[in-house]
Structures are given as C-alpha cells and as structure tokens.
Amino acid sequence: MLSASTMKEVVYWSPKKVADWLLENAMPEYCEPLGHFTGQDLINLTQEDFTKPPLCRVSSDNGQRLLDMIETLKMEHHIEAHKNGHANGHLSIGVDIPNPDGSFSIKIKPNGMPNGFRKEMIKIPMPEPERSQYPMEWGKTLLAFLYALSCFVLTTVMISVVHERVPPKEVQPPLPDTFFDHFNRVQWAFSICEINGMILVGLWLFQWLLLKYKSIISRRFFCIVGTLYLYRCITMYVTTLPVPGMHFNCSPKLFGDWEAQVRRIMKLIAGGGLSITGSHNMCGDYLYSGHTVMLTLTYLFIKEYSPRRLWWYHWICWLLSVVGIFCILLAHDHYTVDVVVAYYITTRLFWWYHTMANQQVLKEASQMNLLARVWWYRPFQYFEKNVQGIVPRSYHWPLPWPVVHLSRQVKYSRLVNDT
C-alpha cells in the first residue's frame, strides 16, 4: 500500500510511478497499454476507455478491478487531505448566550447536536473484497499431475505394444536419413543427451521450488507435458518405423505374454524411460522423440519463469538443450524427422498455451477466438479461469528459516518479482 504522503502526489506521478503502482497491486498486464500514462491520466480513466483498444484486449472484466483500485486511490487521497475535519464545511461552533442574571448559559447548538456538529449520512463507495489474482488451487494441480502421470504410463504401455510390431533389422533395414549420411555414429553421444536432460530437469525442479506461484506454473507444466506424451502415443501407434541403425539390440518379443509385458512396463517406468538407467531396451518409439520433448520443454519453462537479467543462465540452459538434441542425432538413435516433429509440436503447444493463459480475452470462447476450437480448450479454461493476467516471475525462500547474507550477516526473507 502506498503511503499517505505519496497519495498527495498522485496527479504528479510519472509513467514509471504508474507502472510501479500497477505492479504493486498485481496488475502487470496493464503496464504495456498504460505505459505512457501519468498519474493524472490514470485517475481520469473511465469505464468507456475499456471498451476501446488497447484496454479492451487486456481485461475480461471490462477493467472493473483496475477502476475499483483507482477509486480506492482517490478516496485515500481525499481522506488524507481532509483528515483533520476542518475542510469539509460541516464544522460549526455553538454560541454562548448570557442569562438575565448576568451568567452565561450552556451553548446553543445551531443544529441541535452536541458540540455544534450536525449529523449527515455520507455514502462512500468501497470496492468489494476480491479473491487473489493468482490463487494456488492445489487441487487442480493434483488433477493436472494425475493427467500427466496417466499419459506417461500410457506411453510406456504403447512402447511395449509397438515394440512387438517393429520389423527385424535384417528384414527391414534403417530408412535413409540425410543427417546419418553426413555424420558417423558416436556411441557415447546418447549418454550425453540423457545427462543434459537430467541436468535441465534438475535445474527446473530447483527453480520451481523457489517460485512463489509454483502451483499455477507446475499445473501448466503437467498439462503441456501430458498432452505432448499423449500425442506421442498416437504417432507411435499409427506409424511404426524400422530401427534407425544396425547397432540396435532390441529385447526379444513376448508374443502375447502379458505378465512379462507388465514387468517390462514397470521396469521402464521405474527407470524414467532412460537408456542410461538400463530400463529402455525396446524399439519402435521413434516418431516422435520423447528426449527432444523434455530437452526443449524444460528449457522453455526455465527461460519463461526466470528473471530476464539472468541471461547467462538462459544461455547455459539453451546450450545444454541444443547439445542434447544434437547428440540424439549423432548417436543415430532417432531419425531426423523424429527430432524435427518433436521440437515443432513442443514449442507450438508451449507458445499457444501461454498466449492463451496471458490474454484474458482468449479465455472466453467466441466466434472470433479460433484458439477455442482446440480439443483441450475446456480443460484449459478449467485450469486457468481464476488466474488473472500474466503470472509474475516472483520468487521466495521456501524454507522456514531466513536466508543469511554472508557479507553482512543480515538475516532476511527474500522476495523477487522480475516481470
């Protein structure tokens, strides 16, 4: 909340001060359309302004929340200016009337009220208490996690099913691939890919623990990664490609032994689907690459929800992702088309989801909103309907004890909000 002295200067606010006030009140989505507004422009905003661009494209509540905050700002300014009670024109003083015996009687009250005041009813409009702009809603996050987990389990089941259909490499040799024509296979390259992937997942998990709005952001991660693996189940099943290299040693086919298939599926789940853990020795899960999905998606989330000033951190994560994807191809463990399709679907789904989540108008189905035609739009509305605006890149210390600053030995609890 702004101080009373600052309230007196609202009309003199600079555009930067207006932007700071918007961020303090958790309304970062207005910073860009109101970027040139001064304090005077801010308090002159009306309902009509929200019916015209650009404000009509920012808010789905017709700017009601911002207008309520501006009304509160005006009232605090007014109350501060008249807090002593002598500038409102309602203070009147009684008159002492002498008695016939020369003494003075009690004061005659001009309005019949004690102390010379008159009673009036003043109606002050106050904004109604509002819910948090970024509610945690852990129940929805749990539902999104179960969705992602179900899609991951379904993917492992599908890998086991497709493995039974892969033709032997002696019968159906690898398909021609331009990358394989120009780069010889490097045996250890796939291990580098999986190590890079584990590093990126670890960095993202650590970053997630420090996020203030971790429930909302993890919900988005689970929704996107679950949908990507669901798509992967479909592409693997409809088209079974031969192994991409003669170096593959696929595990024997089980020919309907469901008990052995269940054990194989559980082993794959326990090992995280990684070859480096010895859990993945099945073939057929080529179109498209799950490793590329994780390398790309973790980088996108790390960059999206970390401060812009940490450019070096973004470059390190980008390098880990690119090297990992290149090593997939260098190991000849996926066709080039597997990697290209995985990258395309992952980036587009991430960008579509976040564009829709950051624009309130896109959360409402209409004839003009063509994005509302995607099959996952209803679940998206359910998960995102209570999130108002762009989620700030806010961080806080998650542990019960404060951080100790070593250079000054000062204890503090840190909260960073970098938008």
Curated annotation (Swiss-Prot):
Q: Which UniProt keywords apply?
A: Apoptosis, Golgi apparatus, Kinase, Lipid metabolism, Membrane, Phosphoprotein, Sphingolipid metabolism, Transferase, Transmembrane, Transmembrane helix
Q: Family, per the entry? A: Belongs to the sphingomyelin synthase family.
What gene codes for this chain?
Sgms1
Q: Name one GO molecular function term.
A: kinase activity
Give the organism the record lists: Rattus norvegicus
For whether the record's keyword set contains Magnesium, the answer is no
GO terms under biological process: apoptotic process; cellular response to lipopolysaccharide; cellular response to tumor necrosis factor; ceramide biosynthetic process; positive regulation of gene expression; sphingomyelin biosynthetic process
Q: What is its EC number?
A: 2.7.8.27
What protein name applies here? Phosphatidylcholine:ceramide cholinephosphotransferase 1
Sequence ranges on the Cytoplasmic membrane side: 331-419
Annotated signal sequence is none
Source taxonomy: Eukaryota, Metazoa, Chordata, Craniata, Vertebrata
| Biological role | Major sphingomyelin synthase at the Golgi apparatus. Catalyzes the reversible transfer of phosphocholine moiety in sphingomyelin biosynthesis: in the forward reaction transfers phosphocholine head group of phosphatidylcholine (PC) on to ceramide (CER) to form ceramide phosphocholine (sphingomyelin, SM) and diacylglycerol (DAG) as by-product, and in the reverse reaction transfers phosphocholine from SM to DAG to form PC and CER. The direction of the reaction depends on the levels of CER and DAG in Golgi membranes.
Q: Which domain of life is it from?
A: Eukaryota
Please tell me where this protein is predominantly located: Golgi
Which Pfam families has this protein been placed in?
PAP2_C (PF14360)
Where is the SAM domain positioned along the sequence?
13-76
PROSITE patterns cross-referenced by the UniProt entry? SAM_DOMAIN
Q: What is the membrane topology here?
A: Multi-pass membrane protein
The chemistry this enzyme catalyses reads:
an N-acylsphing-4-enine + a 1,2-diacyl-sn-glycero-3-phosphocholine = a sphingomyelin + a 1,2-diacyl-sn-glycerol; 1-(9Z-octadecenoyl)-2-acyl-sn-3-glycerol + a sphingomyelin = a 1-(9Z-octadecenoyl)-2-acyl-sn-glycero-3-phosphocholine + an N-acylsphing-4-enine; N-hexadecanoylsphinganine + a 1,2-diacyl-sn-glycero-3-phosphocholine = N-hexadecanoyl-sphinganine-1-phosphocholine + a 1,2-diacyl-sn-glycerol; N-hexadecanoyl-(4R)-hydroxysphinganine + a 1,2-diacyl-sn-glycero-3-phosphocholine = N-hexadecanoyl-(4R)-hydroxysphinganine-phosphocholine + a 1,2-diacyl-sn-glycerol
InterPro entries reported in the protein's UniProt record: SAM, SAM/pointed_sf, Sphingomyelin_synth-like, Sphingomyelin_synth-like_dom
User: Where does the record place the modification Phosphoserine?
Assistant: 14
